[in-house]
Amino acid sequence: MISYYFQGVALGAAMILPLGPQNAFVMNQGIRRQYHLMIALLCALSDLVLISAGIFGGSALLMQSPWLLALVTWGGVAFLLWYGFGALKTAMSSNLELASAEVMKQGRWKIIATMLAVTWLNPHVYLDTFVVLGSLGGQLAMEPKRWFALGTISASFLWFFGLALLAAWLAPRLRTAKAQRIINILVGVVMWLIAFQLAREGVAHMHALFN
């Protein structure tokens, strides 16, 4: 059964490691050294719930409803475009240091609310956890399924805590205005690239739906 665990770790890592809204938020909180470990924990716990729901039944529900899948897909496109626009707008700000200072004034509960929005209101997360991980893990028998789920969840915990700690360690170099501008441009461009790729999949899905 241990092989299913490592399959889960490998696939979970492949899904979690690419830059996305969650990773960008955890990284930025680590750079600011502002509740970064708490945010990493909440992200990992959110993934635990989403991955478990996807593998143990949620995937079948989503895949059996083409219109719901289309809604999630295009919702993901809109969310990623909006998030990318925000990052690029921050990067192009004439006074990036002032903008960063304003962010640093945010309280714990506002940061938690932002993290929950980035995770739970991001339809792209449901595609990863329900469609990809859920469809693969859902095909397994119950015991291998549990090990597979444990592997994907382990990858999530290791990644988010590792990212938060690494960002905090590199904070002196990454907190400069130049570094922040580069990071925000990178985040914005990647979000838009993912959105366009998802839009292509959405168009193909809609074409199949109407034919």
From Swiss-Prot:
GO terms for molecular function: L-arginine transmembrane transporter activity. It catalyses: L-arginine(in) = L-arginine(out). One of its GO terms (cellular component) is plasma membrane. It is found in: Cell inner membrane. Keywords: Amino-acid transport, Cell inner membrane, Cell membrane, Membrane, Transmembrane, Transmembrane helix, Transport. Its main location: membrane. Coiled coil: none annotated. Involved in the export of arginine. Important to control the intracellular level of arginine and the correct balance between arginine and lysine. Belongs to the LysE/ArgO transporter (TC 2.A.75) family. This is Arginine exporter protein ArgO. It comes from Salmonella paratyphi B (strain ATCC BAA-1250 / SPB7).
